Amino acid sequence: MNFDQKGMKKRSITVAYFFENIGRNHDIKLRRLNRVDEQKRRISERELHRPGLALAGFTNLFTYKRVQILGNTETRFLNNHDEAERRKAFENLVRFKVPCIILTSTNKLQPELLEMATEAGVPVYATRHSSTKAMYLITDFLDDQFSLHQQYHGSMVDVCGVGVLLTGKSGLGKSEIALDLIERGHGLVADDVVIIRRKGESLVLNARRNDIIDHFMEIRGLGVVDVKANFGIRAIRDIKDVQVVVELLEWNRETDYERLGLDMKSIKILGVEVPLVQLPIFPGKNIAVIIEVVALNFLLKHYSNYVAAEALTERIRTSIDKGNEQDDES
């Protein structure tokens, strides 16, 4: 499995896509205030901007490529001027190709200003949320859209609450093992194509399915399996953090595999270190049970800082020390 890929980022999204999708996974509803061609306007930056200085006439450093937020301060500034001055101030904003304007806290735009925005082709929206909350939710949505992401071949399963990514060469039985885990009560996130995202500088990796493949699986000799239809809603997950990578390997008698678990391996995915467990495959080995133990070991270390190999090593060391003391006394 090649995890050395740097990942990809979207360069931009249309304002139409932004308007249609932001309310799906975020608690914010935008109301359209004018009718313009939203496909022609694009958002290319995750940061937002409050154009107070631009409205006042200082546009030298105006970051017009960002979504423009008009809150209480900006709307009151406009309302405190007569119509001619309002138009002049608002012209400083709409003469640039801004992606869109969002009014927060149920603020309203004067009809003549809304007409100016429409003539300039600038979409205008309104939300009941305060500027602080609206900016938080919009930034979170744009963070997700412009996050580093990459597709990987494998299976992603929620095992005992731990996100486990199964990888390995094609034909080793990743899907079959994932199906076995599902039958044992765990949840499928994605099979065959796993999309992994990293938001900004976060060290958390999110895994999700390909929308076309959804929660279908291909099992050799059987065909396509609809996990949701066969096992019910409990057997699927929409998204899960990648917490452990389990790499399935072909058994090789000459290879020296880890036996104690003292040598903890890791692998970099999109610049984030993730614990790696390598499991050799051979007939008769119950991989599903072993993966459950991998997940439980992760939880033990995460919550209790307990590692079985270290505990056993300490017991042996203590026993040897006691034996040496008894020899010295005799």
From Swiss-Prot:
Q: Name one GO biological process term.
A: regulation of carbohydrate metabolic process
Q: Which reaction does it catalyse?
A: [HPr protein]-L-serine + ATP = [HPr protein]-O-phospho-L-serine + ADP + H(+); [HPr protein]-O-phospho-L-serine + phosphate + H(+) = [HPr protein]-L-serine + diphosphate
Q: Which domain of life is it from?
A: Bacteria
Region feature (Important for the catalytic mechanism of dephosphorylation): 280-285
> In the Enzyme Commission scheme, what number(s) does this protein have?
2.7.11.-, 2.7.4.-
List every stretch annotated Important for the catalytic mechanism of both phosphorylation and dephosphorylation: 217-226
* Keyword terms: ATP-binding, Kinase, Magnesium, Metal-binding, Multifunctional enzyme, Nucleotide-binding, Serine/threonine-protein kinase, Transferase
Tell me the residue numbers annotated for binding Mg(2+). 175, 218
Does the keyword field hold Transferase? yes
Q: Can you quote the domain comment?
A: The Walker A ATP-binding motif also binds Pi and PPi.
- Hey, which family's this protein in? Belongs to the HPrK/P family.
| Any further remark recorded for this protein | Both phosphorylation and phosphorolysis are carried out by the same active site and suggest a common mechanism for both reactions.
What does the record give as the function of this protein?
A: Catalyzes the ATP- as well as the pyrophosphate-dependent phosphorylation of a specific serine residue in HPr, a phosphocarrier protein of the phosphoenolpyruvate-dependent sugar phosphotransferase system (PTS). HprK/P also catalyzes the pyrophosphate-producing, inorganic phosphate-dependent dephosphorylation (phosphorolysis) of seryl-phosphorylated HPr (P-Ser-HPr).
Its quaternary organisation is: Homohexamer.
Record protein name field: HPr kinase/phosphorylase
* Recorded name of the encoding gene: hprK
